[in-house]
A protein has these predicted regions:
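VWA/integrin I-like adhesion module and closely mimicked acidic/polar interface patches used
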Residues: 93, 166-172, 207-250, 257
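Von Willebrand factor A/integrin I-like adhesion domains
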Residues: 161, 218, 235-290
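Intrinsically disordered, low-complexity regions enriched in proline, serine, glycine
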Residues: 90-92, 128-137, 147-149, 190-195, ...
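Acidic, polar low-complexity linker/tail segments
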Residues: 19, 26-105
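Intrinsically disordered cytoplasmic terminal tails of membrane proteins
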Residues: 1-40, 312
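Surface-exposed acidic, glycine-flexible loop patches that form ligand/cofactor-binding
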Residues: 68-73, 125-130, 183-195, 219-220
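Von Willebrand factor
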Residues: 72-198, 200-204, 209-212, 233-241
Length: 313
């Protein structure tokens, strides 16, 4: 069963215009039983390494990093993405890479939404190549979208791209989506623990929650097999301080990521020997269970950690 908009256990078709109509509907709290069973059934299946290598080679990923990703997918068989599509995402202080010529690129200014869209589309396409399921939840828009099941000839991925073309608008109801993700993970937690696996939850946002206490919403994740990535889409001090305060309230390991350029500057300050490119940034956004990748922007790696990072790359 595909998940091109899920409602009452049935596959529901939407067009780009229906994204707007769904802006104020109730957040879906439960998966249909059939979808949950289908997802659990993928957890022991190996990722499609051949398709992944072909896709990532076109994006100039080194072989070592591709192997690291494929191996890690056996430990993390599913990913969740909570995507902030609030009105502030149209502010033009984002950054994205424009590629030109042979293996050349430059950083250019764009909206926060354009920066995030580029990332989300890549990760969704990566999910399709790997056949590793990912669920995308927009704060104000479409029903949850699951890609990477390989059962709908790319229909879910096409819908995902259509949704990301919409103009962001609305508030920042993070808590509702976090609560829904908590419930979804709880429903598959037994299967994950049995397989010694985890899932990742990436929250991509540029602001503060408009519908409650985010720390309270995130707290149940401390008892679930999950890794959390916070992808900040702004460097505004009030927002950074807000999320730092939440991090301090929780016994939850949160990997905080900025845009690629700012991450590269931070990493250069601690580990100047490392070239931080797009491939490594996308891998960290996708979410991996590699501790060294969590700390490269926070501290200088010791000799053993450096050896491991070189192995992963």
């Amino acid at each position: 069963m595909s998940a091109v908009g899920i409602e009452d256990g049935q596959k529901k078709q939407h067009t780009a215009s229906s994204h707007e109509k769904l802006a104020h509907t109730t957040v879906k709290q439960q998966w249909p039983v059939s979808l949950r069973q289908q997802l659990i059934g993928t957890f022991k299946q190996p990722p499609n390494e051949k398709q992944a290598r072909a896709f990532l080679a076109d994006h100039y990923w080194p072989d070592g990093l591709i192997s690291t990703l494929v191996k890690d997918c056996k430990k993390i068989p599913m990913h969740f993405f909570i995507v902030d599509d609030s009105g502030s995402m149209i502010i033009e202080d984002g950054k994205k890479i424009i590629k030109y010529g042979f293996n050349k690129a430059k950083m250019t200014k764009c909206t926060r939404w354009a920066e995030l869209t580029e990332s989300m589309i890549f990760l969704a396409e990566l999910s399709e190549a790997l056949l590793v399921p990912c669920e995308f939840r927009l704060l104000n828009g479409a029903d949850p979208i699951v890609v990477g099941l390989g059962d709908d000839k790319g229909e879910s991925f096409s819908f995902m791209k259509d949704v990301m073309e919409d103009t962001p608008a609305g508030t920042t109801p993070l808590c509702a989506q976090i609560n829904a993700v908590v419930q979804s993970i709880s429903s598959i937690a037994e299967a994950l623990r049995k397989n010694n696996q985890k899932v990742t939850v990436m929250i991509a946002t540029d602001g503060e929650s408009s519908d409650g206490n985010v720390a309270d919403a995130l707290r149940p994740l401390t008892d679930l097999p999950v890794l959390v990535v916070l992808r900040l889409c702004t460097s505004e001090k009030t927002v950074v301080d807000y999320w730092n305060n939440i991090d301090q309230q929780l016994e939850l390991d949160i990997d905080v990521l900025d845009n690629q350029q700012d991450e590269a500057l931070q990493i250069n300050g601690h580990n100047s020997w490392m070239v931080y490119g797009e491939a490594l940034h996308r891998l960290r956004e996708f979410g991996v269970s590699i501790k060294e990748m969590d700390v490269i922007d926070q501290s200088t790696l010791n000799s053993e950690q450096m050896h491991m990072m070189c192995h992963y790359l």
